[in-house]
Amino acid sequence: RALDRSDPARSLDALWDGVELRVDLGAVDGRPFVNNASFGVYAEIVSSPAYRDDKAATVLKLLPDLLTGHSGPRLVAHIGANAVEEPQAVLVSNNSYGTSDLAGLSRRDRLDRGVLGVVTLSVSNTREAVDLLRLNNVRGLTQTTAREVIVEADTPEIPVGVDGESLLLRTPVRCTVHPGALRVLVPRDRPGVRVAAPVFDWVRLWRTAFPS
């Protein structure tokens, strides 16, 4: 599932006619992750009991309110040689999601580019939060790639979501990428890379999920 297999039963073909691929692994303080590590508001969402049952709906429901009401530790994200001061949310992924995906809800086209994808969100009110979800508030958004991300805080420990698991880690927290570290056996006869999904319309998705 973590590698986006829509038909797990077909993976059994790899046992008798498989091809080995190498994909990257992320790591947070040495703990490996295939998908992402989340900080700030993102980590609060991962700790929600509803998250495991419906990831997308939980993100859509909680993200705007958490962004504007966040009162957790003050974070500083060191992304390569650059620093983002006091973002409310930081998402570090094993390779990048699409530019319209601010919360790791979509697929990644590749897992072998040897980089971390990084998203940070910073808003000061509800209007800015909605504009950010519409991708109109680019000043509150950082999207980039790096080989290393270090997250500092004004507390000795911070919540971190690692591939959907909620953890408490000592600061600073260091995220790295290990190119080609994971060997994956896949069927020789398999689908190609899927066409990228259309641009996320966060506001439309929110209204569809919560029409009231």
Predicted regions and their residues:
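Small-residue-rich beta-alpha loop regions that form the catalytic core of phosphotransfer
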Residues: 1-55, 180
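Conserved active-site and cofactor/substrate-binding residues in soluble primary-metabolism enzymes
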Residues: 6, 10, 40, 54, ...
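Oxyanion-binding "anion nests"
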Residues: 71-112
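Accessory alpha-helical/coil subdomains and C-terminal extensions
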Residues: 53-81
